[in-house]
C-alpha cells in the first residue's frame, strides 16, 4: 500500500480532537489538525489548522458528538478549506480508547465483535469508553468504506506479571469482576520506548527503563526487556502519583470516612479525589504547576507543600522501580508537558539518586525546556542516561492503524 490518508480521533467527554495524515511507512504529513470543544452546548468551538492556515468557528450549537462529527466532515470537505475532496479519500480511522481491559492486548481493527467486547467493559471507563463507542458507531455510517482501528491506553501494560497487576483483595474479585491494575498512558510509553531504543542504539528487547509521563495526569512505568513490567496507575487513572487534580495513592478507608463526615455519597467523594485533589487540593489555588511555582517562589506555604508532596511521591516510585528492576536500568526518561518543560521538577525528582550513580547535569537540565526537543541531561559521571523525550501518542496510533489496514 502506498500513501494513504488516515484520520486520528481522540474522543473526550465534551471534546473531539482530530488529526488528518497522509502516511507512508515511517513518513507522515499532517494535512489538518484541530479540536471541537464544548460539545453538548450552544457555545461549541471548532479550531483547525491546515495548509499553514488557522480557522476558528465559535458559538456553534453542537449538542452531541454525532453532530460534532458532521461539523468535522463539513470542515474537511468544504470549498474554503479544500483539505480533502471527498470522504472516501480517508481509508483508515484510528481511535484512542482509554480502557481495553484485559481483553485487548494490542490495537485491533474494529468490527461488531470488538464493539460488543468494548461495551462489556465500558464500566471500567464510564466517562470515556461509552462516548468513544458512540463515535465509532457513527463513523461506520459516515465512513462506510474506511477501516477503523482501536488503539488502547491499557494494551501496553498487558505484559505485566500477576505479582505486579493483582491487588491483595479476594482473588474472586479478579476472577469474577476483573478487579486489577491496568495502567494507562500506554500509547505514550510505547512511543518513548521505541524512541529510546533508537537514541541509545539498542534493541528494544534489551532495554530496561523508568519512564515518567508527567502532565496534568501523571504516571510512571518500569520497562524490563522492552516491555511494561509495572506502572503506577491502577484499575483507573486515580492511583499512583500526585497529579493536577487527582490524589494518587490514598488509604481507601478515607472514602467511607469522608462520605460520613461530609454527608456525601461515595460517588461524590470519588469525584473530589479525581477533580478537586492532587496539586489543586493541596495548593488550594490551581492544578497548573506554572501557577503553583509562582506562589511557591513567593514562599506561599501550600504551594511549596504541593511541590514537595508531588516530587516526594515521584522519588518513592522511582526508588521502588529501581529495586523492582534489580537496579539494572539503561535510562530514566521524562516526558509529557511537565516532564519536558519543568527542569525544577526533574531535578527534585532525582535529588539524592546521585549517591547511587544517577546524576543530572544541572546546566543541561536547566536548558532543556523546549517541549518539542529531545535532550540528554545526564552528567558525564552518571551510570545511566537521563533523557527528556517529547511523547507522540498520535504517531503510535497512526503507525498501528497503518500496520493493521495496509493489507486489508
UniProtKB/Swiss-Prot annotation:
Enzyme class label: transferase
Q: Required co-factor?
A: Mg(2+); Mn(2+)
Q: What is this protein called?
A: Acetate kinase
Its lineage reads: Bacteria, Pseudomonadati, Spirochaetota, Spirochaetia, Spirochaetales
Species for this entry? Borrelia duttonii (strain Ly)
Looking up InterPro entries in the UniProt record yields: Ac/propionate_kinase (IPR004372), Aliphatic_acid_kin_short-chain (IPR000890), Aliphatic_acid_kinase_CS (IPR023865), ATPase_NBD (IPR043129)
The record's listing under SUPFAM superfamilies reads: Actin-like ATPase domain
The record's PROSITE patterns line, in alphabetical order, gives: ACETATE_KINASE_1 (PS01075), ACETATE_KINASE_2 (PS01076)
**What superkingdom heads the lineage?**
Bacteria
UniProt function note: Catalyzes the formation of acetyl phosphate from acetate and ATP. Can also catalyze the reverse reaction.
Q: Which GO terms describe its molecular function?
A: acetate kinase activity; ATP binding; magnesium ion binding
List localization entries. Cytoplasm
Q: Tell me the residue numbers annotated for binding ATP.
A: 17, 213-217, 288-290
Question: For this protein, what reaction is catalysed?
Answer: acetate + ATP = acetyl phosphate + ADP
Please tell me where Mg(2+) binds in this chain.
10, 393
Key word Kinase present: yes
EC number(s) on record?
2.7.2.1
